[in-house]
């Protein structure tokens, strides 16, 4: 299995899943937020569109679907059975399996960013959409914090060597926040230095090993004792429940997202 990332819109990724066999021209795409880059890549590489995986319904993950199929042909659209996106042809739910080329992906329901959000898991690859980012996690809008916390803990239980293919490139800002949340964690400082260099050189920071996320992503570490203590100190009434810890962490990140502090320093 070969996975290629196509940068789309301002900071999105559409993922192309291809065969390692050069004679097999079938390929799937994940979360096409726009069509032209996908069409160009398929035509340039003489690929045949075989199917589409959708993690959730937001426009920046779905707006390219019709344009892609107009150009490359209609195919199966696989997404959550409960989602509002009507063109889904193959609805799936927790525990279902999806055959992609010669590989099998497991469907994991991860509500939080949206009600119907799902991830597609293979021991080598996790398409995490806007649930788990490199160094961070997706925003929660109207859903309860405990939903997202539980979804992230489900993903944390997956194998360390799995590569995380998320929906956006937010790695530098996310790790700047991780440094603020856990300032004395060497793994975070080392990763931030590497990510800063790569970002300055326009080298993608996605994908990343899930094992590295477990070491450096505060949204997979909110129940880690030192970070727990920091979060409880930010609460009016200290509470170590998973939902409250996560909500405190997410609110802290949201607060800093309103400033430019997390994007600063790239030109230093």
From Swiss-Prot:
Pathway terms, separated by semicolons: Secondary metabolite metabolism; methylglyoxal degradation; (R)-lactate from methylglyoxal: step 2/2
Cofactor note: Binds 2 Zn(2+) ions per subunit.
Pfam families: HAGH_C, Lactamase_B
Binding-site positions, Zn(2+) 1: 56, 58, 113, 130
Annotated coiled-coil segments of the chain: none
Cofactor(s) this protein cannot do without: Zn(2+)
Superkingdom to which the source organism belongs: Bacteria
Molecular function as annotated in GO: hydroxyacylglutathione hydrolase activity; metal ion binding
Complexes and interactors: Monomer.
Family, as annotated: Belongs to the metallo-beta-lactamase superfamily. Glyoxalase II family.
Protein name: Hydroxyacylglutathione hydrolase
Protein species of origin: Hydrogenovibrio crunogenus (strain DSM 25203 / XCL-2) (Thiomicrospira crunogena)
Gene from which this protein is expressed: gloB
């Amino acid at each position: 299995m070969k996975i290629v990332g196509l940068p789309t819109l301002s900071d999105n990724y559409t993922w192309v899943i291809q065969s390692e066999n050069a004679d097999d021209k079938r390929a799937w795409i994940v979360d096409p937020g726009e069509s032209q880059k996908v069409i160009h890549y398929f035509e340039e590489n003489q690929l045949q569109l075989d199917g589409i995986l959708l993690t959730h319904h937001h426009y920046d993950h779905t707006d390219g679907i019709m344009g892609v199929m107009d150009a490359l042909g209609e195919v199966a659209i696989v997404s959550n059975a409960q989602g509002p996106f009507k063109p889904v042809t193959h609805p799936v739910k927790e525990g279902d399996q999806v055959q992609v080329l010669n590989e099998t992906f497991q469907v994991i329901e991860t509500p939080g960013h949206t009600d119907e959000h799902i991830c597609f898991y293979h021991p080598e690859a996790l398409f995490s959409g806007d649930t788990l980012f490199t160094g961070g996690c997706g925003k929660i809008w109207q859903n309860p914090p405990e939903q997202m916390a539980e979804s992230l803990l489900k993903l944390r239980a997956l194998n360390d060597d799995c590569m995380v293919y998320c929906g956006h490139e937010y790695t530098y800002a996310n790790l700047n926040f991780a440094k603020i949340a856990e300032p004395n964690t060497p793994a975070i400082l080392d990763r931030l230095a590497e990510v800063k260099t790569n970002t300055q050189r326009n080298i993608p920071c996605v994908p990343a090993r899930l094992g590295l996320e477990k070491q450096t992503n505060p949204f997979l570490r909110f129940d880690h004792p030192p970070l727990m203590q920091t979060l409880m100190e930010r609460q009016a009434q200290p509470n170590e429940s998973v939902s409250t810890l996560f909500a405190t962490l997410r609110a802290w990140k949201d607060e800093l997202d309103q400033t430019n502090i997390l994007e600063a320093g790239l030109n230093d």
